[in-house]
Amino acid sequence: MAAADPAPTHARERRDVVVPVSGPEDPPERAWLVLPHRHPVSTLLDETRDAVVGLAETLAAVLPVTVLAHPRDAGAARLVPPEVDLLRAPVGSPLLGRTGPSFIRRPEGLAAVAWRSAAGLTGTGPLDGAAATAVAEAAGLPLLTPLLCAPRGAWVTDGEGTAVVAADPVLDGRINGAWTPGQVAAEFAALLGITRVLWVPPAPRPDTGPWGGPGHLASWVRLQGDGEAAVHWRGDRFHPEHPYAAAALRFLQGADDAAGRPLRVRTVTGAAQPAEYDPAERGPRSLLDTLPLGAAVLRPAFEDAAGEEAAAAACTALHPGLPQLSFPAPPLLRLAGALNDLVLLQPRP
């Protein structure tokens, strides 16, 4: 697209009132997941499907859950428990939290945003775009389709007008052509109500899960509101997660949020890998990979006592007062992805 037109989008229909997009602490109305019917490693498909169903059951203890399954998935009805809604849709990977729709509040109510696909460059597949349509139709929400590709996994927000955005992929010329940082920031302001965009500069970031592509930025950076932020950390300079963690930390320290407050940034060291672990596990063992659910918070669980203690303490600091649910992180990283990669939370109207 031409660089002179910074952000053509259907959202231009209503720009008089733009409410900042929901932050991580906003209570959700429903959780959405995808039950995959294919897998990059075919021998792991059944185990992955079982893990997704287990995650749905865990979430269903505190809020309504819908699982999307492909129309040709004959076994889905037997797997999905009765307390979880099953919806047929032409979906692909289970990375709905990374590639699914974003939700915005407009004067007339909640709407969904289907970002332009970056299939093949961010771990997405050709069918992932259909998930946004399926979710919007099932939820009865209008669907906006901007020309910008800013997948939900590439940015996080505090719900107060500030967003941290990964320069890679959003400023990747293969994905967004000649879009400049200023043009992207203008689109974020018009569509999402975000008035302060902070860019994490490009740095090596390990893939998360067997579908490939960088995992959700929420595993690396958490904006907590009131000028507070947390960064997933690895102090060992030889650790493959150190370069991206260091890039995020350097950039955010001293940066201001949308209210003009200097961000107070702290580091949260990820859980350690035990001496014996499955080398197929891909992605950060991040303690920031949590999902506030309103009445509770879902956090990653780990196989060793030290990891569990650290995860519980980090979750308490991030979400004080919320009861904690947990789900094993190492199997998910081996089979599918992080919690924020897999779970899409729809905010209340």
For the regions a protein language model found, what residue spans apply to each?
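The feature marks the mature, well-folded catalytic cores of soluble enzymes
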Residues: 2-349
